[in-house]
Design a protein with these regions (language model features):
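Conserved small/polar residues in nucleotide/adenosyl-binding loops
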Residues: 419-425
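N-terminal capping/small domains of soluble enzymes
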Residues: 1-223, 229
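Glycine-rich phosphate-binding active-site loops on the catalytic face of alpha/beta enzymes
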Residues: 83-89, 364-386
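Glycine/Thr-rich beta-alpha phosphate-binding loop at enzyme active sites
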Residues: 27-40, 244-343, 378-393
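Catalytic cores of alpha/beta
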Residues: 353-366
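Structural preference for beta-strand elements that scaffold enzyme active sites
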Residues: 56-58, 81, 146-154, 233-237, ...
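Active-site beta-loop-alpha junctions enriched in small/polar residues
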Residues: 62-64, 87, 239-243, 300-304, ...
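C-terminal helical cap(s) of enzyme catalytic domains, especially alpha/beta-barrels
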Residues: 94-106, 377-399
Length: 428
């Protein structure tokens, strides 16, 4: 496994994309017949942060959203809410490899970007220009591609105020100069792109990712800064430990049967507590109202568990759970929070989402649904096409009771550990 990312040049990437389209009728190995073609009358079209979304789904901040070609591939397959990989001031981190284990449920020891801050910005700018160019070249309807780039930043206010992060936030707010240069490169292969008005602002919204153990006043200070000083619609990524030790363990170990996955006491000890989260979220909703912005939560982060599998380096004492078992935990957390806020808390959902449960998540009130673990399985980005097929059956204004769905997830065979499943009597 390679130890370092080495992004290719913009001219090489653009040549690859447009030449492959002309010579093979495919892009990045995806044949044209599998491109998602948006429809104006699609039942799943929606909005977030005052932007139109052709679909409410996309890749979660993670391995799928670090390089331009990955972002473009996900867009071609129907992703329209794209969470960009988390960027932080420390951009020379040593990531243990392998860092992802997805034999079934997911475990990882990876965290923020593996590129320099300026390299991350460049990747996102390339993807932005390519998406706008391909939207026109492929003849898709609408003047704009109906896509939202959701920034992800971390991990504390001191880091976000560092010069490289200040430059990054400035660049995402106005990348006109670099966007213009990239449009010129694209025009060498597709001259009509020069006639497009590709926006210089890549994003006006952000998800705050904080370290485990970040105190509520720090989370509140960072979020307030992002709204008051940066004018960004803001989501706070919450940890599943917010459900509390009894809530998490009863679902994970008892209901779902993942008895090997041990959530240590310290995970609950250093993470944000529910009693502290509620006043914090109320305060931040008030700040958002004062700023004329939207504020909400992303549910959820991964779950800290003891490293019991022989995959990661022995020095990794903890690893982070994702995928199937996290779904039930996070849905039950969503139910608890929405009960607290009378269903008015803006929520983006990312925890064990798949093609079958995504319509349910939209119907219980999730504004967007993002995916990571499921995309790391066979099919990759093409799995998004089945998500959209399932969303086609979504009735306008369809609503499902969140409390009932939360209860259902605790015994859903698709979430239960395979070693915990028992055959019906007639099959024995």
């Amino acid at each position: 496994m390679g130890e370092l990312f080495r992004p290719i040049g913009a001219d090489q990437l653009f040549d690859w994309v447009f030449t492959e389209l002309e010579t093979r009728d495919s892009i990045l190995g995806i044949p044209r017949e599998l491109f998602f073609v948006p429809r104006r009358d699609a039942p799943y079209r929606s909005t977030i942060f005052n932007h139109s979304l052709e679909t409410p789904i996309g890749p979660a901040a993670g391995p799928h959203t670090q390089l331009a070609q990955n972002i473009v591939a996900s867009w071609l397959c129907g992703a329209r809410y794209i969470e960009l990989k988390t960027v932080q001031t420390l951009d020379e981190i040593d990531v243990s490899k392998p860092c992802i284990d997805l034999e079934d449920e997911g475990y990882n020891v990876e965290w923020s970007q593996e590129l320099k801050v300026h390299e991350s910005a460049e990747e996102y700018e390339r993807a932005w220009v390519l998406i706008h160019a391909l939207h026109r070249k492929l003849g898709f309807p609408g003047a704009s591609p109906g896509v939202v780039f959701n920034l992800s930043v971390g991990y504390n206010l001191e880091g976000i105020r560092q010069p490289n992060m200040q430059w990054y936030l400035d660049e995402m707010a106005d990348a006109s100069a670099r966007v213009g240069e990239l449009v010129d490169i694209a025009a060498q292969h597709y001259p009509e792109v020069a006639d497009l008005q590709v926006p210089g602002r890549l994003s006006d919204n952000v998800c705050l990712s904080t370290m485990h153990g970040c105190p509520p006043d720090e989370i509140e200070s960072i979020s307030a800064y992002l709204m008051q000083e940066r004018g960004l619609h803001t989501l706070v990524k919450c940890n599943p430990t917010l459900l509390g030790p009894e809530g998490v363990r009863s679902i994970l170990n008892e209901d779902l049967g993942y008895t090997d996955a041990v959530v240590p006491d310290e995970a609950f000890g250093h993470d944000l507590k529910y009693a502290d989260a509620i006043p914090m979220l109320n305060n931040l909703r008030g700040i958002a109202d004062e700023c004329g912005l939207e504020f909400g939560v992303k549910l959820s982060n991964t779950l800290e568990v003891e490293n019991f599998r022989p995959v990661f380096d022995e020095k990794e004492k903890m690893m982070y759970l994702s995928g199937r078992p996290l779904h039930a935990i996070t849905v039950n957390l969503a139910d608890k929070l929405q009960t607290e806020f009378d269903g008015e808390l803006l929520m983006s959902f990312s925890a064990g989402a798949d093609c079958f449960n995504t319509p349910h998540l939209i119907a219980v009130g999730a504004r967007t649904v993002t995916v990571c673990s499921d995309l790391l399985k066979t099919g990759g980005y093409l799995r998004f096409l089945q998500y959209i097929e399932e969303l086609e059956n979504l009735q306008p204004d369809a609503r499902i009771d969140l409390a009932a769905y939360a209860k259902e997830t605790r015994s859903d065979p698709r979430s239960v550990s395979y070693t915990h499943l028992t055959l019906p009597t007639k099959c024995r």
